């Protein structure tokens, strides 16, 4: 379980006299439960990636608290990270290594014994339908193949919590469907707590047990798709989202996320 309480983060844009402070995240709160998929839904620049980077201990919040299975991310970052699988940017693969070697390398980083890591690679290959990829070098992989390898790396230490930042970006229809089915299995068969950010309505409707709508750096609504639609009285979920996020069509103010450091999640762990 991941709990986020009153999370805030500012960034300074520009230099000298042109410098200004932009509030990227402003009091975001939500709880992501075990055995459920929680979608962080918002327009570009809403603060989704910044929020997930703070959850993954890649950014320090200015205010607020994050706990992962009861562990305070600020006070116990290494212990919390050990209980998270973060889907790093697929460009972070080591292209001279095979998919298997990439996954096993991350197993060693997480301290997974070799006798445990080997069978886990095989099990993940079956679950993600990537067995033909295992012994190929990742250079030249398609976006979907890279995504599967990155997801396997994120899961190799069997974390109870999984974080994905817009995981279907750049994927074709078949790769998107494959990823969606994998996430369902992780939820239904293994009881994982899964958080993913997106701005795609269909992903939310098909996957999410809970939706957290973020706009202008704030949590503006949360609940199931049915509950959010009932709240607005609108049958179409896209219209529901527009009503909740923009008040029926108001333009969002510029956010730091689209102009500064919080690029897609990436780094030295997954």
Task: Show the residue positions of the predicted features.
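ABC ATPase "signature
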Residues: 222-223
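Catalytic Walker B motif of ABC-type/P-loop ATPase nucleotide-binding domains
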Residues: 162-166
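Conserved ABC transporter NBD signature motif
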Residues: 64-75, 79-80
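Helical segment within the ABC ATPase nucleotide-binding domain
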Residues: 177-190
């Amino acid at each position: 379980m991941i709990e986020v309480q009153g999370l805030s983060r500012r960034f300074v844009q520009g230099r000298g006299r042109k410098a200004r402070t932009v509030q990227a995240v402003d009091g975001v709160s939500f709880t992501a439960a075990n055995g459920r998929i929680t979608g962080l839904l918002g327009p570009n620049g809403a603060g989704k990636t910044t929020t997930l980077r703070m959850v993954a201990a890649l950014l320090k919040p200015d205010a607020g608290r994050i706990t992962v299975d009861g562990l305070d991310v600020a006070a116990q970052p290494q212990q919390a990270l050990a209980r998270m699988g973060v889907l790093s940017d697929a460009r972070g693969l080591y292209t001279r290594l095979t998919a298997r070697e990439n996954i096993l390398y991350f197993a060693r980083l997480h301290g997974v014994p070799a006798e445990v890591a080997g069978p886990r690679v095989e099990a993940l290959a079956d679950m993600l339908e990537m067995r033909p990829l295992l012994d190929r070098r990742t250079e030249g992989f398609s976006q979907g193949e890279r995504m599967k390898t990155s997801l396997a790396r994120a899961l190799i230490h069997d974390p109870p919590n999984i974080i994905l930042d817009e995981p279907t970006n750049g994927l074709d229809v078949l790769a998107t469907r494959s990823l969606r089915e994998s996430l369902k299995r992780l939820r239904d068969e293994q009881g994982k707590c899964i958080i993913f950010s997106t701005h795609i309505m269909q992903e939310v409707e098909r996957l999410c047990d809970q939706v957290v709508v973020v706009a202008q750096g704030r949590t503006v609504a949360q609940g199931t798709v049915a509950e959010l639609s009932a709240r607005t009285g609108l049958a179409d979920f896209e219209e529901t989202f527009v009503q909740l996020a923009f008040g029926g069509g108001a333009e969002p103010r510029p956010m730091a996320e689209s102009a500064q450091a919080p690029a897609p999640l990436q780094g030295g762990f997954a």
